[in-house]
């Protein structure tokens, strides 16, 4: 079981790999498709299983993730299973999925203080553990 499922666009892979490394260094167990989906498996079914098994859903906001049909499916599956949503702004984007607008975002853009905001993300992952345990 993972602490957090990471939803992102493949075009943002360098940032997501760095973020995954930072989360792992902070004793978190992030789920990412490049390391958690075996070859020849039904990749979408594995993604859905990863979402269902995770405590939280981290959506990396960028123009590419916002435009991604797969990311939209992941968000909808997350909502269907009442998972905790954590929007993380990596790049400014328009037309963000409606459900993300109801949540307070974390900002890990290049202009932001990455280390300070990473600590906010870690705190957010640790907050409201009763809710996380229920779902």
Walk through the language-model features, giving the residues of each.
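An anion/phosphate-binding loop that grips the pyrophosphate of nucleotide cofactors and donors
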Residues: 54
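C-terminal interaction surface of TIR/SEFIR-family domains
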Residues: 1-26, 41, 45, 89-135
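Acidic, metal-coordinating catalytic cores used for nucleic-acid/nucleotide bond scission
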Residues: 9-11, 37-42, 63-70
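Conserved TIR/SEFIR loop-to-helix hotspot centered on a Trp-containing motif
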Residues: 63-83
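Hydrophobic acceptor-binding patch used for acceptor engagement in glycosyltransferases
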Residues: 57-58
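Conserved RecA-like helicase motor-core motifs
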Residues: 27-37
């Amino acid at each position: 079981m993972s602490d957090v499922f990471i939803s992102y666009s493949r075009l943002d892979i360098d940032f997501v790999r760095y973020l995954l490394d930072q989360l792992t260094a902070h004793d978190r167990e992030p789920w990412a498709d490049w390391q958690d989906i075996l070859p020849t498996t039904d990749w979408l079914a594995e993604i859905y299983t990863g979402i269902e098994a995770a405590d939280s859903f981290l959506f990396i906001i960028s123009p590419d993730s916002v435009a991604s049909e797969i990311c939209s499916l992941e968000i909808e599956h997350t909502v269907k299973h009442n998972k905790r949503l954590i929007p993380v702004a990596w790049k400014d984007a328009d037309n963000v999925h409606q459900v993300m607008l109801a949540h307070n975002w974390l900002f890990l853009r290049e202009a932001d203080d990455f280390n300070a905001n990473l600590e906010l993300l870690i705190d957010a992952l640790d907050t409201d553990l009763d809710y996380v345990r229920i779902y």
